[in-house]
Amino acid sequence: MPMTSKRVLVLAAAAVKLLACSSASEPVDMGSAGAAVSAGGPAGGGAGNPLAGAGGNLSAAGGLTAGGASPSGGAFAAGGASNSGGAFAAGGALAAGGASNSGGALGVSGGSSAAGAAGAGSTSNCAVAPIDPSATPEAKKLLCYLYSIYGNKVLSGQQETSWSNPQGDIDYYVQTVNKHPAILGGDYLYTDGAKLGNNTSVRAQAYWAAGGLTMLRYHMGAPPLADTYDNSKGAVANFDNLTKSGTSENTSLNSKLDYMAAELKFLQDAKVPVMLVPYHEIDKFAWFWWSKCTGAQFINLWKYSVDYITKTKGVHNVLWMVGYGHDGAMADFWPGKEYADLGGIDQYDKGTQPFANLYAGTKAVVGPTMPIPLHETGTIPQPSAMFPTAAPWLMWNVWATYQNTAAEGYTWNTPETIKSAYADSHTITRETLPNLK
């Protein structure tokens, strides 16, 4: 038996023992928010590989952590010990067909995959297609689903607190409403580091296996700076050089895109589609380096990045999402529908109103038919106020710990507002997503 297969079988047995002996989850330390990300090799193995590691660890919930055996061929079980597209179940058994793990691999507290459950939109006879002509079947199916629900349903989402206890964010919803958000948000800034506790791509794969969706972003350091949050607010000495072959800026950008492509390729091999917001919060305040430029310069960067990831690196499981910032969508920073599958916005205003002005402004830029996500928000807009016409967002995605904290002197989302939003008939959770595999 190959060594990788032996390692996986040992890990599976350990998972059974772990779950049998303990009902408590142990917090996972993801390291500090400013931890630098290494632009290492592919996720499948090699130097700098954020997934590689000796001795394979088990997460507190029973799934494989990033420090464990590197998944091969898109399955947790390498070398032929396949899990048939699913994830490890709570008892350590292999779950077929993407079934949920009750207590394992992000399926905490009884999450279910809800194949064919309510909230599904029809994806038959779909007339839309991703901008990537070589898009994977999973990416195509996901985009069709998003279009099918747009205007009638809204996807719930939660960004993980990657620098603390990432599972804690999801657990909070289970404890509060006994449901999981439909979307798990992750960030490739926090994939690697000295205190790595769980890998972004592995967690995304596990959430997909348990029946959920994933949306990823990347707080990329300004080339040639290292990838830290502070460096994502830096500046590029010569922005035009980013897309000019042979320049130091271009070499650095390519290295960062190589790193992201390797992570996305890992998910592609696992047949996981990704909603990707590579350069989010584009706005006139120029919070991040990719906004410290003209609209034409940003569009060149965007198109270069899309072409590099898809054509040069062979990544085809991505739905490309342009993400505007708090002050509204900017038409001169819009790359066009030929280079964007979705166009959305971030916001941090207080209250549970539908933020109709931001929705209308974004719609004026991206067009009347493209689904518009609220892909980062401090507060949850109440679905009862969003529909049918005020602001029928495709999704909301609550940022990090804003679901239950009194950050900046006030509470962002009380348990009462969370319960109201998740109980609304318009809201789709992980439990009510259809089987999109």
Task: Enumerate the predicted regions with their spans.
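Substrate-binding cleft of secreted/luminal carbohydrate-active enzymes
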Residues: 150-161, 370-437
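Substrate-binding cleft of extracellular glycoside hydrolase catalytic domains
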Residues: 193-315
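Aromatic- and acid-rich polysaccharide-binding/catalytic face
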Residues: 330-353, 397-399
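Alpha-helical scaffolding within the catalytic cores
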Residues: 141, 164-173, 198-202, 259-263, ...
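Bacterial N-terminal signal peptides that target proteins for export
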Residues: 1-10
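Ser/Thr-rich, Pro/Gly/Ala-heavy low-complexity intrinsically disordered linkers and tails
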Residues: 13, 18-124
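Aromatic-lined carbohydrate-recognition surfaces of secreted/lumenal glycan-active proteins
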Residues: 157-159, 277-279, 302-329, 369-380
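Boundary/entry segment of secreted carbohydrate-active catalytic domains
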Residues: 124-176, 180-189
